[in-house]
Swiss-Prot record:
One of its GO terms (cellular component) is cytosol. Homotetramer and homodimer (in equilibrium). Activated by phosphorylation and inhibited by fructose 1,6-bisphosphate (FBP). Key enzyme in the regulation of glycerol uptake and metabolism. Catalyzes the phosphorylation of glycerol to yield sn-glycerol 3-phosphate. The keyword ATP-binding applies. CDD domains: FGGY_EcGK_like. Its EC number is 2.7.1.30. GO terms for molecular function: ATP binding; glycerol kinase activity. This is Glycerol kinase. GO terms for biological process: glycerol catabolic process; glycerol metabolic process; glycerol-3-phosphate metabolic process. It comes from Staphylococcus aureus (strain COL). ATP binds at T12, T13, S14, T266, G309, Q313, G410. SUPFAM superfamilies: Actin-like ATPase domain. Keywords: ATP-binding, Glycerol metabolism, Kinase, Nucleotide-binding, Phosphoprotein, Transferase.
Length: 498
């Protein structure tokens, strides 16, 4: 009887369940979208119960649609949108407020106040993160401060906090396991990534009671089992958890120090495995935990690009220059260059290494001869320039020269982007056969814990290259183009609207 690992990939707009066989191949996929809530400008929320319902639905669907029985599932792995915060009543199991999503800016004033009080460096040193609304800690404080009776309940030990992984494990296990893993804990602003413990000083600054917090576990171990009524009468081990970007790093088999992956999703996320050393960044990168296995933690440097694949959506939906995302490639390759046009897609500011939230998008170098093809090509090239910005910051901070870049996400199907990426970073770009690397990473973590795979070496053999893009551009051309990009970014930062 063939066995499978069931991977739950709980994302920002949809929940997915993917079955993987022993070769790491996909044996079935189910997906369901859920509602986004925008109660005020800049606020983004989800209903945690709707997320839970969507996860139950896709788990059921992937098993039913693929003629798989529940007793063929060897283990369950979970990967999740990181930082999104749920606070719920531990007796009723009901969330006391919507889940506050990672994108939501509603805790800006809390962050500003803590900065004014001089605590920014304290958070940076202990957590490796910036004091920003992006991360979970200030979201928990906001819920306790703004939901009537919440703080009193929390002090009495009646409330639980969790990121989405914690919420799902708690629900799946029938309230038996209130846990998170090192990778998700490291995104909360409350976890000391050096001591590997919840930090009392940070909790005091955020006024969050410690009794709400989940137990922090390895990214690969059996946390509990599915309660029989949620899973066809079967008690299946829940055995792997990692935040989405860290799961993608693991799914790309980036197990060695200096291994790098870049995800081209709506935004872009680059992670470098820095081994057992938490590298302090001087270049606007985050220091984070990649994963914890067998009592050992691996750290990572992370760079965030706010606009990546969404720039292509903008060409399609906003400007109506293309009818479909794949069309952008054929337009871009009709011309040999952009003729000096640069697009800086700072629609919501600039991420790593600039961290300029006030910047807005700009276009430079237009002439009467500029055509649609030049504009589209310049937009695609912007994804690659931003990636080089992050990669240079990583090399500088870590002292490691990147030997190859493993890639995933929607935009990697675009061969023009992949080749230009290799050219502009002067490094080989490796596109894997299985691009569902986030779900695959969660499956690998769960599979290791239940003996489905023996070791990381065993897993690395499952990683298969679809295509390798080697740099073809000469040095002079590459550096000239990149100098132009740096000038364009500089000019973008000068222009600020009132």
């Amino acid at each position: 009887m063939e066995k499978y690992i069931l991977s739950i990939d709980q994302g920002t707009t949809s929940s997915r369940a993917i079955l993987f066989n022993q070769k790491g191949e996909i044996a079935g996929v189910a997906q369901r979208e859920f509602k986004q809530y925008f109660p005020q400008s800049g606020w983004v929320e989800h209903d945690a119960n709707e997320i839970w319902t969507s996860v139950l639905a896709v788990m059921t669907e992937v098993i039913n649609e693929n003629d798989v029985r529940a007793d063929q599932i060897a283990g369950i792995g979970i990967t999740n949108q990181r930082e999104t915060t749920v606070v719920w009543d531990k007796h009723t199991g009901r969330p006391i407020y919507h889940a506050i999503v990672w994108q939501s800016r509603q805790t800006q004033s809390i962050c500003s106040e803590l900065k004014q009080q001089g605590y920014e460096q304290t958070f940076r040193d202990k957590t490796g993160l910036l004091l920003d609304p992006y991360f979970a800690g200030t979201k928990v404080k906001w819920i306790l401060d703004n939901v009537e009776g919440a703080r009193e309940k929390a002090e009495n030990g009646d409330l639980l906090f969790g990121t989405i992984d914690t919420w799902l494990v708690w629900k799946l296990s029938g309230k038996a396991a209130h846990i998170t893993d090192y990778s998700n804990a490291s995104r909360t602003l409350m976890f000391n990534i050096h001591d590997l413990e919840w930090d009392d000083e940070l909790l005091e600054l955020l006024t969050v009671p410690k009794n709400m917090l989940p137990e922090v576990k390895a990214s690969s171990e059996v946390y509990g089992k599915t309660i029989d009524y949620h899973f066809y009468g079967q008690e299946v081990p829940i055995a792997g958890v990692a935040g989405d970007q860290q799961a993608a790093l693991f799914g790309q088999a980036c197990f060695e120090r200096g291994d790098v992956k870049n995800t081209y999703g709506t935004g872009g996320f680059m992670l470098m495995n820095t081994g057992d050393k938490a590298v302090k960044s001087e270049s606007g990168l985050l220091t984070t935990i990649a994963y914890g296995i067998d009592g050992k933690v691996n750290y990572a440097l992370e760079g965030s690009i706010f606009v990546s694949g969404s720039a292509i959506q903008w060409l399609r939906d906003g400007l109506r220059m293309i009818n479909s995302a794949p069309q952008s490639e054929s337009y871009a390759t009709r011309v040999d260059s952009t003729e000096g046009v640069y697009v800086v897609p700072a629609f919501v500011g600039l991420g790593t290494p600039y961290w300029d939230s006030e910047a807005r998008g700009a276009i430079f170098g237009l002439t009467r001869g500029t055509e649609k093809e030049h504009f589209i090509r310049a937009t695609l090239e912007s994804l690659c320039y931003q990636t080089r910005d992050v990669m240079e910051a990583m090399s500088k901070d870590s002292g490691i020269d990147v030997q190859s870049l493993r890639v995933d996400g929607g935009a990697v199907k675009n061969n023009f982007i992949m080749q230009f990426q290799a050219d502009i970073v002067n490094t080989s770009v490796e596109r894997p056969e299985i691009q569902e690397t986030t779900a695959l990473g969660a499956a690998f973590l769960a599979g290791l814990a239940v003996g489905f795979w023996e070791s990381k070496d065993d897993i690395a053999k499952n990683w298969k290259l679809e295509e390798k893009f080697d740099p073809k551009m000469d040095e002079g051309e590459r550096e000239k183009l990149y100098r132009g990009w740096k000038k364009a970014v500089e000019a973008t930062q000068v222009f600020k609207t009132e």
